[in-house]
Amino acid sequence: MNVLAAAMRDAMTRSPHALVVLDKDSDTWRSCPWPEVHGMAESIAARLLQRDRLGAVGLVGEPTAELIAAIQGAWLAGVAVSLLPRPRRGADPSEWAHSTLRRFGGIGVDTVLSHGGVLRTLAAADSTVSICDLTQAARTPTSTGLEYQDDSGVAILQGTAGSTGNPRTAVLSPAAVLSNMRGLIERLRLDGASDRACSWLPLYHDMGLAFLLTSVLSGMPLWQAPTGAFSAAPLRWAEWLSDSQATFTAGPNFGYSMIGRYSGRVRDVDLGALRIAINGGEPVDCEGFQRFATAMAPFGFRAAAATPAYGMAEATCAVTMPFCGEGLQIDERTESGVRQRYALLGRPIAGMQLRIAATDQPSAEGVGEVEIRGSSMMTGYLGDTTGRSDGDWFPTGDIGYLVDGALVICGRSKEVITVAGRNIFPTEIEQVAAQVDGVRHGGVVAVGSKSGAAQSRLLIAAEFVGADRNVTRSAVIKRVISVCGVTPADVVLMPPGSLPRTSSGKLRRLEVRRQLLG
């Protein structure tokens, strides 16, 4: 048994607490004690070990107790696990099934476990990948002589975001995953005896999976809601935090911004127990996060709980994290007469290191590409024959700088927009444009043209939800000029949901640029 599976087994079997899952159909919470979840994991491992040939295991479906147990079940069986998203609303079921099974097959998955309607959709597709009923597997009889399998060297095949290019698969070892989880537990001072976790994050995303595993390894109770339940009604997140009296939660900037923006609709919630609210997975909007903290203060939310962080799938998840109680700290810089505010994202967790390296692009003093290394790093990308050594520095593609050892991220190097010699990061423009009436929140992309640096033009694409396109377009241009000090060459308004996104919801800026420029 690998070190991660052993640590998971010890935590689950010894915990007096439970996994509590929201059933989206009945809208009720269902509790399953952690020892019972591990019992299902052993059953799933027994089912997997009955197969003549066993490669990596794929998981697709709502986050039921059985699906969560299957993650540990794969590790007990000595194989890696990979999770992929359910079909999006409006997707053709057959096309989704074939695409998903091709993706699984391409990374070495030969057995997929699923349940419900997704199981039936996958089973109807023609594929060499074996499709198994997750619910039945969780009920497989086990003998006291179940033999845990040796470490395969791979725990997770984790898809990367692909927001600036084609998604790749990071190969994560059991030791790397365990190191990352322990680093988080140490930094956040998580205690299974007193902490309670609540999440709606997708488990196929590195932040959602890391949140789950950190909660399990600390031995705390976890309330897990399907991502679709949040998407349908984002303000329910506040209700779930109140109902669970959670002390620990996490979400992308978008989630906090939605609650802050529509806080007038929040009623009768108690957020007084919450001591850690991680904001990660996408650039932190300081104004939006502050708006959330201020709006939720009457409901007991403490500003010290705001925890902006930095991470990536290639490092399992977390790279930097503030210490408990630091709250949202902001660094202000003035460049070309324009003031910018950036969140401090904390220092590296135990086992991780970072440095700022020089880039080819002109930049302010101390600003450069973030490079990382450490015990949480991936073994490499699947199929990459070049490999990497443990001590190698990994270039993240993110541009940032340090403030007293705390990391600040400005943006992605591939996405920098250069206008008249000035470097502009897309989020600076997007966060300002998103505040205009008629623009869908979280539906703005700023890109530069393909021209040379001196002649580059700023282009903005925004999803339109207003009444008058001309009024909204003019308002976006005026606000960007006023706040950012740059004039957009064009503002393209698009139907809601039309901007391309990754499976985790991140906007694909480079694809938007290709569309706008033909």
Show where each model-derived region lies:
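Conserved AMP-binding A3 loop
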Residues: 31-35, 148, 155-182
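AMP-binding/adenylate-forming catalytic core of the ANL superfamily
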Residues: 249, 374, 379-380, 399-484, ...
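Conserved AMP-binding/adenylation subdomain of ANL enzymes
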Residues: 178-196, 206-247, 262-263
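AMP-binding/adenylate-forming catalytic domain of the ANL superfamily
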Residues: 482-506
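Adenylate-forming
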Residues: 117-120, 229, 246-293, 306-315, ...
